[in-house]
Amino acid sequence: MRRILVIRWILAIHLIATQVFAERIKDIATLAGVRVNQLVGYGLVVGLSGTGDKTGTKFTEDSFANMLTQLGINIPPGVRLNSKNIAAVMVTANLSSFMKKGQTMDVNISSIGDSKSLLGGTLLLTPLKGADGRVYAMSQGNIVVSGISASGSDGSSVTVNVPSGGRIPNGATIEADIPNPFYYSNSLTYNLHTPDFTTAKRMSDAINELMGPGTAKAIDAGSVVVTAPKKLSQRVDYVSVLENIEFKPGEPMAKIIINARTGTVVISSNVIVKSAAVSHGNLVVSITETPVISQPNAFASGRTVATQQSQVNIQQKNNRAFILPKGTTLKDIVRGINAVGATPADVISILEALQQAGALSATLIVI
């Protein structure tokens, strides 16, 4: 059985090398379970030079008192702790799927109180938990801060970058492995980055052509299930072959994305316009405010005042029309719009009008 699999994989590699398609599976889909897992924890940073949380920050003082109690140091009732050299922080990290116990990873430190700077601080031992509440790593170490803040006695201050946050390179040690279906599942599921029925069908067909009929099955527009080898030792080679299979994805939907704030317009290459004529005029409205001094007569009882005299001009520029014949493509649209000297705002208006007229065969999305 193993010999048959090896021969099939060699044949698959040969076929992959002789075919030229648009995309590899690894570029348009991800293996279910192979992901980054977010970890978070609450901790204390000590060793700050008077830039920590201000005295009276209750959650910082309570956390500091609890930590001292756990270390066997009892705080007399009613005693308030000075927390100027201490800051309460949130610690975050990203744990990859295949990282193991004992390995280290970087962590980000962010102040949650009113600390001015974490420069020179040390994070005390902090557990990092996942979404399931389990502790997956422990973090501790000296913080690297890229920002700096300085203030004078008169209240003036200068801040460069963000001194209230920092990083600890290799500052967390992994204490537990993330459960991963790659090790125990009878099948492997690939999730498409952009769900599409045609792409899912073509992907499963490409896998079946190279790995054998019935190996892969598209279950919906976003997922393709592939039968996995029972032996774990064969799965790495198997996935290595799968993710390098190349095929031509389905054509995406015709879309036009408009950013109304910035005037950015993105048009996909398969946008088609039906026969239409476009005429777009520009109205230029200018309002000029001229200051006027009102000076009363010498013996009058009035007073000198400054007023504004407004002048409003409305000018309509000569508008030009252009015709979009049936089957017009992206290139023709851009050429026609540029020919009349349209601004980004004009382009948005023209595209919206074309869709309202039923001449635009695309989905118009305004963000």
Swiss-Prot record:
Alphabetical keyword list: Bacterial flagellum, Periplasm, Signal
The family this protein is said to belong to: Belongs to the FlgI family.
Disulfide cross-links: none
Signal peptide start and end residues: 1-22
Name of protein: Flagellar P-ring protein
UniProt gene name: flgI
GO cellular component, one term: outer membrane-bounded periplasmic space
Domain of life: Bacteria
GO molecular function: structural molecule activity
Keyword Signal part of the UniProt annotation: yes
Organism of this sequence: Legionella pneumophila (strain Paris)
InterPro entries: Flag_FlgI
Complex and partners: The basal body constitutes a major portion of the flagellar organelle and consists of four rings (L,P,S, and M) mounted on a central rod.
Subcellular localization(s) per the UniProt record: Periplasm; Bacterial flagellum basal body
